[in-house]
Amino acid sequence: MSIFSSLYVAMSGIRSNEVGMGIIGDNIANMNTIGFKGSRGVFSDILNTTIMGEPGLSEVGQGSMATSVQRLVGQGALLQTGVSTDLAIGGNGFFMMKGQVSGTDATFYSRNGQFRIDEDGFLANMGGLQLLGFPASLTTGEVGTNIAPLQVGTQISPPKATNNVTLDVNLDPKEPQLGPGATLDTTDESTMASTSSFSTTTTWYDSLGEAHDVDLYYIHQQSGEWSWHAVVDQGELDPALAGNFQEVGTGTLTFTSDGLLDTYTPPPPGPSLTIQFDGASSQDVTFDWGDAITTDAVAGIAGSGVGTSSYATKSAVVTVSQDGFGAGDLTFIDFDRDGTIHGTFSNGDQRTLGRVAMANFLSPDQLNAVGGNSFLESPGSGEPAVGEPNTGGRGMIFNSSLEQSNVDLSNEFTNMIVTQRGFQASSRTVTTADQMLTELINLKR
């Protein structure tokens, strides 16, 4: 190798170490970038001349060169954020997103799970790329098989008409007995109050999600026997009749000498009453008064008497609940490990909204980086194996968490020192070769 050749060899070392330092600098700059995967330089030697000698084959090197940059796709640490739309992948795989990056409209892949619900209701990252997944039917909650952008923010929980009312009431046996066959006078509120022993108000929902007040009046007929009467303002049934009252259902309640619920009518399995509110569909409503000893036994159920009671204490409502609700807006979303998205609505309803899709690659380190912490598939990466999280070698989803960069700062500083020394040594080779050339030129003097 000539002195001139040593200059070029040294320059190749300088260039290689420059590339290496650039890679290290990029890793350090992105040590706090969510989902970032560090890289390392791949270098090789350069051969210019092969000399065949008696002892064997030897090669004269011409320095080094950077041949490629290899992405290190190891797992990063998970950071809990408390933000419900933040997602992290534990294991292999990438989030799939649809949109544009640098003018390219395609499906992109990323480990950055910083998502939000955008103005159109889509789960999207901060760059506007929409998260892909398997949307679910809002009516059935069944997750589909077609991949599409997950639009969850615009979903509305449809209303449900009241069909079951559960009551736990205590009716004071010391209330005056109004006599067998006593009825409720629905002329007005004052007559209903004077012809009953106790009353309470419940709220029911019709098929359109409209709320209606239904009053329940109780009459102490005789010892151990009460009647109940469901009353509504007729304006709830026909606006033209507002101000008038109508009894829409009635039945009886009997109690044992211990104050336990013995029987009630109408008995199951039929409804307690049928009602049709204005503009809505007709609905059957069944009252559950508790475990009636005799009534439930006839229906094949072990009756314990627990529920509505008649104890010597003030008449009062213990609990009242019903299964209807109005339409509701989405207020909160949550994710399971398999990527299933659950929505909680303002009406208390909870529904499955879909499932996050994930893609895995045979050679994920060969994906093409396009900026924004996103990648495109390449011939080297292979085609994406798309499916549900936690299946087919794909990792699990951790909600309210983010995957941190997998850059190890201590390793990067170590590599920086080694690279710096390599750069200095190559520079010294240039200086030394220059001195040798100077000496060679001075031989002529």
Predicted regions and their residues:
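N-terminal intrinsically disordered, low-complexity, charge/repeat-rich segments that act as generic
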Residues: 1-40, 45
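Amphipathic alpha-helical coiled-coil segments
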Residues: 14-17, 21, 409, 416, ...
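Small/polar low-complexity and glycine-rich loop motifs
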Residues: 37-407, 411-415, 422
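Acidic/polar, glycine-anchored loop/turn motif associated with catalytic or activation segments
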Residues: 426
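Structured functional modules or segments
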Residues: 436-445
